[in-house]
């Protein structure tokens, strides 16, 4: 669960955090600028071990096209480096010894020991594009072999004042019961979860037995999973509560945070999952750091992979984060007041190809009927729904027309929301005990599970796999007669407040599922007509 539990001073979020840095002693050959913000803070909090001794370092470059980058390959060879590139890709990886990369790009590359003992290499400066490569290369990534990942051990209170949502209450609250009653329970659908931890089959069995659901054993891809910490268990049980007939798969993502090349590993992992499970629904409740640690070139492989996944009919949901809009503060010392450099969004959740899911506090009656919903914020616990404005990505077409006072040109997150407050969350079983789930890492599998039902409905009524769902969600929000979302207008986080329509805390809102399923089918048909082919025709 993306949450950090040390108390923060929400009122201090607009204070400026001054980052002191000593004078540079490195001579630069290409005028590479010093990287500031959270990247500089990460290095400042680490011990500089001197020039890197890494024998296998890398950085990502984006290419002008998908043809073989001959100039780049020749240049790298002349600098004792290599290029890793696959035909058809518009990005490549420059690899070699750290000192060779430092010399070639004219930047220092040092080894660092982080606050938790991890050793990594990094350059405090942004490599610039060598003039000799301008015919092939359009962008150069950062040199950094470590990204702080997000998956804190969830804390499920045993003494909450409410019993939590049962599976039936969850379906009722989000108006999914009409779909279930019509027979849409996930049969023939596949839900894929990407996880850093594992699950205990005894928990899953107890959960299924408690609620008279069919027992289930998820398929595991990518090798043995780490011991359960609560995240994977919550994801699986929440999804099974919604779509008990769906096939559930857990992909072991831990290798992506071991060593360098994180985004290359993520992209290859996504490519493999897309090949194995076409037309599936993906749910991510983990994170790979604040986007201010990277630049657009670094994540180009992941964006390419997700675009290919969309072509296979895959929809992707990711938790926006639990730091109340302060994703760039991350796991750093919460005894210091947050400042502007701490405001930011999660790297993967902010990608335009991903549906980012924020969090709410949900109020229902005794039968689970929706009564009210507010943006989730818990000041004493330093938690809340994350969201904000991307620094890296232009405003996607599907968000054109949305008015946000502090930005007009960039990607906005989250896209949607669901219950995340652990005091109003879903009843689950963890450690053979009843618990209440929470966090946006609960909200993401809720949306993924509900999308399984909607996908099944759309297919059964002449549509296509929902796949790249964001354009459909925004089209449905703009032009449908049936209300498809609960518009969240109260609550807030450390940075923004919700308001009527789209906002940076809860996006378009939480789902009114049966209505939304019909609206998505209508939006898909309208999209198909505009594209010049018949719905259901591919």
Regions found by a protein language model. Name each.
Residues 21, 26-88, 93, 98-359, ...:
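Substrate-binding/charge-relay-adjacent region of secreted/lumenal peptidase catalytic domains
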């Amino acid at each position: 669960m993306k949450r950090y539990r040390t108390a923060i001073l929400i009122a201090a979020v607009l204070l400026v955090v001054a980052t002191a840095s000593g004078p540079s002693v490195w001579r630069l050959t290409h005028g590479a600028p010093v990287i500031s913000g959270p990247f500089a803070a990460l290095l400042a909090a680490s011990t500089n071990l001197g020039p890197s001794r890494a024998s296998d370092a890398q950085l990502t470059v984006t290419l002008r096209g998908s043809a073989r980058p001959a100039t780049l390959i020749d240049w790298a060879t002349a600098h004792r480096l290599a290029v890793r590139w696959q035909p058809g890709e518009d990005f490549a990886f420059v690899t070699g010894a750290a000192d060779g990369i430092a010399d070639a790009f004219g930047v220092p590359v040092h080894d660092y020991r982080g606050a938790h003992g991890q050793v990594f290499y990094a350059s405090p400066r942004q490599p610039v594009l060598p003039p000799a490569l301008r015919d092939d290369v359009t962008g150069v990534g950062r040199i950094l072999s470590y990204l702080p990942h997000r998956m804190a051990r969830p804390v499920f209170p045993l003494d909450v004042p409410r019993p939590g949502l049962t599976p039936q209450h969850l379906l009722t609250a989000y108006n999914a019961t009409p779909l279930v009653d019509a027979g849409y329970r996930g049969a023939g659908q596949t839900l894929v979860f990407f996880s850093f931890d594992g699950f205990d089959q005894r928990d899953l069995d107890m959960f299924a037995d408690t609620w008279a659901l069919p027992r289930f054993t998820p398929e595991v891809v990518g090798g043995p999973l780490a011991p359960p910490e609560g995240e994977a268990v919550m994801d699986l049980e929440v999804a099974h509560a919604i779509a008990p007939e769906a096939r559930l798969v857990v992909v072991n993502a831990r290798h992506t945070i071991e060593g360098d090349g994180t985004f290359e590993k993520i992209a290859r992992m996504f490519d493999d999952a897309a090949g194995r499970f076409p037309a599936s629904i993906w749910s991510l409740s983990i994170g790979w750091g604040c986007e201010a640690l990277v630049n657009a070139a670094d994540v180009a492989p992941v964006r390419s992979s997700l675009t290919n996944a969309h072509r296979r009919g895959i929809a992707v949901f990711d938790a926006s984060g639990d730091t109340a809009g302060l994703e760039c503060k991350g796991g750093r010392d919460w005894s210091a007041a947050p400042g502007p450099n701490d405001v930011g969004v999660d790297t993967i959740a902010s990608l335009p190809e991903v549906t980012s899911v924020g969090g709410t506090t949900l109020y229902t009656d005794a039968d689970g009927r929706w009564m009210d919903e507010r943006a989730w914020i818990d000041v004493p616990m330093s938690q809340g729904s994350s969201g904000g404005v991307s620094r890296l990505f232009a405003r996607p077409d599907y968000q054109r027309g949305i008015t946000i006072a502090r930005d007009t040109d960039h990607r906005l997150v989250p896209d949607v929301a669901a219950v995340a407050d652990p005091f109003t969350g879903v009843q689950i079983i963890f450690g053979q005990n009843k618990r209440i789930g929470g966090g946006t890492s609960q909200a993401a599998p809720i949306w993924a599970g509900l999308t399984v039902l909607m996908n099944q409905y759309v297919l059964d009524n002449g549509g296509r796999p929902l796949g790249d769902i964001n354009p459909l969600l925004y089209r449905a929000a703009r032009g449908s007669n049936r209300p498809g979302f609960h518009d969240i207008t109260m609550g807030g986080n450390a940075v923004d407040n919700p308001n009527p329509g789209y906002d940076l805390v809860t996006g378009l809102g939480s789902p009114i599922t049966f209505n939304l399923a019909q609206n998505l089918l209508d939006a898909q048909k309208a999209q198909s007509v505009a594209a010049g082919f018949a719905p259901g025709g591919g």
